[in-house]
Amino acid sequence: NRIEGYEIPELIEVHCTDNDQTVEVQYISHHNNMIRTDLQGIPLHFNHLKRNIYVANFSGREFVMKL
């Protein structure tokens, strides 16, 4: 799976900016400027912010993905 030349791994580390923790999400798919992932059964949709940075929000928390 590739987006604009970036290889997308099956498991992706994302950083929660609210509690300063890093967690792994499972890649599901991508479409346009969004990447769908799964965090322990919870769907997270990361939107492209800039360059290789994607951001998702869930339950009041922000998650950042760098590819």
What kind of region is each of these model predictions?
Residues N1-L67:
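Cysteine-centric segments in proteins
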